[in-house]
Amino acid sequence: MKEIILATSNPGKIKELEQLLAPTICIPQADLGIFDAEETGLSFIENAILKARHASSLANKPALADDSGLVVPSLNGEPGIYSARYAGRKANDEDNIQQLLSKMADLSQEQRQAYFFCAIALMQHAKDPTPIIATGIFHGIISVKPSGTNGFGYDPVFYLNEYQCTAAELPAKIKNRISHRAKALNQLRALLPD
């Protein structure tokens, strides 16, 4: 892959994808005047396909979309596919984190288990009948308060026992090796034709 459209407007995702996909030339959809597709799917995979197809159809080029989010089993999978808008459509990362911490205030350590799930869809063209789908999972625990300034989204409350810090305290070099997005992209690379 020499050039690909990134079907996202999320600056954090764009930065991570550009780092993880190098040396591929990544063109954020906004650079081409493409707005986000409406996420009407019922799963991360459905939403990734919708977003990749939308960007590919408008750019007339291959497009890659990532739909990912935080899953907390003790909250019946919340925030799940609604991770970016957990505290409402106009919410920012801090609002979403506060909503999550509020819902988890009375939960025990065992009930604070969580994971990030990433689904990546690569469409060679808008009518691609066989998009390449890859997934990755990143396990952790939801901390009781935010810590760290790296990353984005729920990273400041996503605690990693193995590293004794949150994802927001990890250096990008380490996070880009172990995260759900890194795992999904590694799987995608293995699925790409030579």
From Swiss-Prot:
The record's Gene Ontology cellular component field reads:
cytosol
Among the GO biological process terms of this entry, one is: purine nucleoside triphosphate catabolic process
Catalytic positions are 67
In short, the EC number is 3.6.1.66
Name the InterPro entries for this protein.
dITP/XTP_pyrophosphatase (IPR020922), ITPase-like_fam (IPR029001), RdgB/HAM1 (IPR002637)
The cross-references to Pfam families, in alphabetical order and at most eight, read: Ham1p_like (PF01725)
Q: Name one GO molecular function term.
A: metal ion binding
Q: How does it assemble?
A: Homodimer.
Name the family.
Belongs to the HAM1 NTPase family.
User: Which protein is depicted?
Assistant: dITP/XTP pyrophosphatase
Q: Which organism is the protein's source?
A: Legionella pneumophila (strain Paris)
